[in-house]
Amino acid sequence: MKGKTAAVQIKNRAKAAATVSEKQLIGRGVRYFPFAFEDKQPNKRKFDNDMQHELRILEELFYYTHDEQSRYISELKAELRKDGFIPENDKDKVLTTFKLKSEFADNENFKNLLIWANKKIPNPNAKANNADSLKANPPPQPLPFPVHGKLLQETQFTADENDEKARQIGTQNNFTETIEMSEIERHIFNKALHIKGKNSQSLFHFDRLQSKLNIQNRNELQNNLLKDWQIEFLGLGQDKQISPDDKLAGCLKILEMVEKHLNESDIPFIGTKEFTPKKLWEIFGTPKQKWVKKDDVKTAIATQNDWYVMDNFAGTSLEEALIQFISERLGDLKSKYDVHLIRNEEVFKLNNFADGEGFMPDFILLLKDKQKSSSNGVNDFLHYQIFIEPKGEHLVETDMWKKEFLEAITAEYGKDKILQKDTPHYRLIGLPFFTDNEKNPKEYEQFTKSFPLGEASLEK
């Protein structure tokens, strides 16, 4: 289904066994032909909750039948539910629309507020970092490699529990020789690269190798970056001669280790430290439709809180607790700021400084000081854009990078550093996770008191 949808005609004579086969096809189809789009992960479905996106059709498979009560379709749905490809009950979810309340959509001043985000860019230091990593981090021990046809054989056996172990060692030669990659003949190393690089998508296809490493030729890889990588050949004869085939096989093993090392250490992207603004209306002005659990829809939360910007709410009990937490502190907030809370329905994204990984904070709290102040020679209202992420305790460890990223945003733009010279009155703050840990509300409140969620302010 690459670049197009597929349709399948169904006939009632299809047997139940065929539905299992069809389920497997669909299951694989979920993963077939992954494609890159913006910053979304290429190997995952991207538009399940975005009903209006034009590319959603690339992830759809259509079935049609002359019989609306088709047994085949019913059996197919049952099989798909077993493996979790569709919900247990289609009625559990409802298509829900989220948009700005009319009083905000019609307010030009509000629509023109600036919302700041950074970008994901190629890591300008990726090649140099990868090369340095290979050079500086050879395996601590040489790669042990038994030579072909001369493996040291050892057998241990016990007659019964009281007997001492008897050891029988084969009579093959048992000499070893350790050599560095720079000592391997160039033509053997190049042949190993050629074998590994036959597939154009292989890391060792030279064009791709150059895209990962700051090298000009294969010789530089062997004699510079891998110079200290070693192979220990085991089971040699007394003359310690190593055959070309064994050297080639050893090189291939080393290249497997190199690929694993690069896959683990390579950071191809970063998030910019520079944040740029868009008008709030550009990001949140278009209504968003999503399939959500029916029980999660709590429209009253939106309608009863005039400071809640969206006209609808669907979320977890933890997200409700966060809104209640803020609501209980509105008195202090509203005495000093204009207060607005936006639920981010997957339309606003930040990018982790360290690796460019996308992050959509669940909530953005906007505070605008009611009194003008002077900053960088400009007299204007101070604005805080505060990122808040409720997080179940079971997810805290997995998403620790998000917490660290939020802390880094606060350190970078929370107090002194201005975002742009002509807009010096904007500050960005990332708060700690709001969790369901029983200690969290008290800890969270203590932390927020040092930020503009109480009487304190970050103004200088």
Curated annotation (Swiss-Prot):
Superkingdom is Bacteria
This one is known as Uncharacterized protein HI_1054
Q: Which organism is it from?
A: Haemophilus influenzae (strain ATCC 51907 / DSM 11121 / KW20 / Rd)
